[in-house]
A protein has these predicted regions:
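Internal catalytic or translocation cores that form aromatic/hydrophobic pockets or channels
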Residues: 40, 54, 69, 87-91
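Alpha-helical residues within the helix-turn-helix
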Residues: 46, 63-64
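Conserved segment of winged-helix/HTH DNA-binding domains
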Residues: 76-103
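Hydrophobic, well-ordered secondary-structure scaffolds
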Residues: 10-12, 31, 54
């Protein structure tokens, strides 16, 4: 089951990390690719026709933002890292409301 990230405008560091992750067209393409797939870095690189080093960097940024999860699994020669979408919904309250107790 995927998660929901709900932020307020006061969660500046987390919003900055997510905004950075979403600011790249390549990272948006990776998110679309991982929408229904769990892939390793070489599969992402091959499908998007980019160097593996670029794919690894983009996935790392997406992972640091909390949008993607990467887990090591046994592979043919050692282990490989599989990446998938961690979050299916993101919302940011720009004007959060507060409950004020009445006297």
């Amino acid at each position: 089951m995927k998660n929901t990230i709900h932020l307020s405008i006061y969660d500046t560091e987390q919003i900055s990390n997510i905004a950075k992750a979403l600011s790249s067209e390549q990272r948006l393409k990776i998110l679309k690719l991982l929408d229904d797939n769990v892939l390793n870095i070489s599969e992402v690189a091959a499908r998007l026709k980019m160097p593996m080093s670029s794919a690894a960097l983009h996935i790392k940024i997406l992972e640091e933002s909390g949008l993607v999860i990467t887990q090591p699994v046994p592979g043919i020669r050692g282990s490989q890292k599989l990446s998938g979408i961690k979050v299916d919904h993101l919302s940011i309250d720009l004007k959060p409301s507060y409950n004020v107790d009445s006297p």
